[in-house]
């Protein structure tokens, strides 16, 4: 009887369940979208119960649609949108407020106040993160401060906090396991990534009671089992958890120090495995935990690009220059260059290494001869320039020269982007056969814990290259183009609207 690992990939707009066989191949996929809530400008929320319902639905669907029985599932792995915060009543199991999503800016004033009080460096040193609304800690404080009776309940030990992984494990296990893993804990602003413990000083600054917090576990171990009524009468081990970007790093088999992956999703996320050393960044990168296995933690440097694949959506939906995302490639390759046009897609500011939230998008170098093809090509090239910005910051901070870049996400199907990426970073770009690397990473973590795979070496053999893009551009051309990009970014930062 063939066995499978069931991977739950709980994302920002949809929940997915993917079955993987022993070769790491996909044996079935189910997906369901859920509602986004925008109660005020800049606020983004989800209903945690709707997320839970969507996860139950896709788990059921992937098993039913693929003629798989529940007793063929060897283990369950979970990967999740990181930082999104749920606070719920531990007796009723009901969330006391919507889940506050990672994108939501509603805790800006809390962050500003803590900065004014001089605590920014304290958070940076202990957590490796910036004091920003992006991360979970200030979201928990906001819920306790703004939901009537919440703080009193929390002090009495009646409330639980969790990121989405914690919420799902708690629900799946029938309230038996209130846990998170090192990778998700490291995104909360409350976890000391050096001591590997919840930090009392940070909790005091955020006024969050410690009794709400989940137990922090390895990214690969059996946390509990599915309660029989949620899973066809079967008690299946829940055995792997990692935040989405860290799961993608693991799914790309980036197990060695200096291994790098870049995800081209709506935004872009680059992670470098820095081994057992938490590298302090001087270049606007985050220091984070990649994963914890067998009592050992691996750290990572992370760079965030706010606009990546969404720039292509903008060409399609906003400007109506293309009818479909794949069309952008054929337009871009009709011309040999952009003729000096640069697009800086700072629609919501600039991420790593600039961290300029006030910047807005700009276009430079237009002439009467500029055509649609030049504009589209310049937009695609912007994804690659931003990636080089992050990669240079990583090399500088870590002292490691990147030997190859493993890639995933929607935009990697675009061969023009992949080749230009290799050219502009002067490094080989490796596109894997299985691009569902986030779900695959969660499956690998769960599979290791239940003996489905023996070791990381065993897993690395499952990683298969679809295509390798080697740099073809000469040095002079590459550096000239990149100098132009740096000038364009500089000019973008000068222009600020009132």
From Swiss-Prot:
GO BP of this protein: glycerol catabolic process; glycerol metabolic process; glycerol-3-phosphate metabolic process
Catalytic activity, EC: 2.7.1.30
Entry GO CC: cytosol
Database matches in CDD domains: FGGY_EcGK_like
Highest taxon listed in the record's lineage: Bacteria
Positions annotated to bind sn-glycerol 3-phosphate: 12, 82-83, 134, 244
GO molecular function per UniProt: ATP binding; glycerol kinase activity
Residues binding ATP, per UniProt: 12-14, 266, 309, 313, 410
Family in the record: Belongs to the FGGY kinase family.
Binding partners and assembly: Homotetramer and homodimer (in equilibrium).
Protein name: Glycerol kinase
Native species: Staphylococcus aureus (strain COL)
Recorded name of the encoding gene: glpK
């Amino acid at each position: 009887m063939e066995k499978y690992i069931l991977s739950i990939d709980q994302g920002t707009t949809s929940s997915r369940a993917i079955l993987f066989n022993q070769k790491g191949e996909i044996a079935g996929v189910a997906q369901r979208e859920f509602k986004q809530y925008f109660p005020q400008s800049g606020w983004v929320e989800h209903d945690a119960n709707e997320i839970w319902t969507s996860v139950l639905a896709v788990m059921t669907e992937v098993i039913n649609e693929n003629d798989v029985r529940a007793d063929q599932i060897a283990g369950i792995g979970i990967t999740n949108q990181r930082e999104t915060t749920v606070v719920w009543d531990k007796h009723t199991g009901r969330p006391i407020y919507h889940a506050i999503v990672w994108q939501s800016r509603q805790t800006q004033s809390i962050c500003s106040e803590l900065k004014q009080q001089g605590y920014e460096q304290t958070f940076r040193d202990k957590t490796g993160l910036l004091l920003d609304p992006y991360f979970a800690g200030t979201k928990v404080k906001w819920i306790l401060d703004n939901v009537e009776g919440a703080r009193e309940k929390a002090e009495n030990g009646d409330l639980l906090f969790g990121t989405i992984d914690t919420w799902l494990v708690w629900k799946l296990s029938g309230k038996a396991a209130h846990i998170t893993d090192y990778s998700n804990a490291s995104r909360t602003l409350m976890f000391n990534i050096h001591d590997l413990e919840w930090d009392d000083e940070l909790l005091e600054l955020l006024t969050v009671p410690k009794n709400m917090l989940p137990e922090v576990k390895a990214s690969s171990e059996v946390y509990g089992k599915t309660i029989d009524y949620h899973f066809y009468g079967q008690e299946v081990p829940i055995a792997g958890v990692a935040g989405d970007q860290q799961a993608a790093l693991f799914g790309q088999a980036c197990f060695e120090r200096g291994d790098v992956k870049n995800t081209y999703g709506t935004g872009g996320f680059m992670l470098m495995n820095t081994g057992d050393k938490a590298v302090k960044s001087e270049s606007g990168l985050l220091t984070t935990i990649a994963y914890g296995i067998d009592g050992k933690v691996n750290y990572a440097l992370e760079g965030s690009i706010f606009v990546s694949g969404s720039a292509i959506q903008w060409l399609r939906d906003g400007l109506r220059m293309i009818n479909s995302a794949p069309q952008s490639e054929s337009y871009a390759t009709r011309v040999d260059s952009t003729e000096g046009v640069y697009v800086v897609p700072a629609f919501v500011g600039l991420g790593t290494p600039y961290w300029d939230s006030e910047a807005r998008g700009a276009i430079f170098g237009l002439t009467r001869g500029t055509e649609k093809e030049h504009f589209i090509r310049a937009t695609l090239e912007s994804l690659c320039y931003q990636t080089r910005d992050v990669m240079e910051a990583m090399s500088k901070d870590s002292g490691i020269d990147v030997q190859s870049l493993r890639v995933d996400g929607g935009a990697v199907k675009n061969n023009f982007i992949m080749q230009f990426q290799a050219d502009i970073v002067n490094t080989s770009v490796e596109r894997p056969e299985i691009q569902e690397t986030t779900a695959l990473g969660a499956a690998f973590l769960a599979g290791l814990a239940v003996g489905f795979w023996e070791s990381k070496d065993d897993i690395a053999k499952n990683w298969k290259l679809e295509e390798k893009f080697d740099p073809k551009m000469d040095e002079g051309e590459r550096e000239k183009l990149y100098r132009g990009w740096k000038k364009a970014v500089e000019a973008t930062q000068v222009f600020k609207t009132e």
